[in-house]
Amino acid sequence: MHTTFLQNIPLAKQKHQLFSGMRRLAFEQLNLKGYDVVISSTTAEAKGIITDERTLHISYINTPTRYLWSHYEEYLAHPGFGVLDPLARWQLRRTVQKARKWDFAAAQRPDVLLANSKHVQKRIQKYYQRESQVVYPVVDVERFMKRRHPRPRHVPDRYMLAVSRLVPYKRIDIAVQACEQAGYPLIVIGAGPQLKSLRKIAGPQTQFLGEVKDSLVEAYLQHASAFLFPGEEDFGITPVESLASGTPVIAYRRGGATETVADSVGVLVRQQSVAAFVRAIQEYDATCYDADILQLRAQEFSRERFIAELQRVVRASLESVG
């Protein structure tokens, strides 16, 4: 493994958002000479690596850079730096046009672009004006299927579950308020800067567990009545993990969830609102779902499938360039 100069800069890992300009430079300075194939995976700058003319560069785009394009206004409203938010807003406004020019140019460098969902494929066309192929990301579905965990202690007989970083765009606030209004217990696993504000709107129905070990996440998923997913994601790994656990998903009908959650495995909610999720929770009937069907759906996103599709793309791309 080869690292860049950013490895030695304090806070570059914990607060990487503050170092976007340096990240661009770091990727451009990587020595990638002599390789036949280079595969980059990116949500921002990694697609901007510079390769030899004879090198095939395939870039797996998890999303066009969110804070520059699709979610620019949202990042301005909630930068996520606490007391440094005013400084972050000023910096983003000051640099966004220059950053967009670099980001667009960087997206023209790879020979092949892969999108992690049809939703992202549309964004790639919109912001980068390039065609791409959809290869859904790998989900470790076997981890959630290989063994059944005992029911966690001190949990309600029935409960909704949310597993997420606690940041604004995940919309865990909708899950909390909807469960409180519906009178349905909710367990939230995860940490993040929004925890304090979420606690303020939570009532007796909601438990915040913070970060827990993997085996407990698996257990809570396996025994939940349903998994709540009120945010809009580019793909969304956790809904597939829920399906692999045999647990249906109640998700907002936008983004990657529309490609993973079908009627036979969950509920898609048309509006991203508390009222809409309250209705979905009140009308939800867990007995309508078959765990075997849910797990079969999850297996469509397995590691083996991902490897096979990626190998196919590499072979086809190499053949096309002779």
Predicted feature locations:
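Membrane-proximal helix-turn-helix segments that form the acceptor-binding/catalytic region
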Residues: 80-113, 121
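Conserved acidic donor-binding segment of nucleotide-sugar-dependent glycosyltransferases
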Residues: 210, 263-274, 281-288
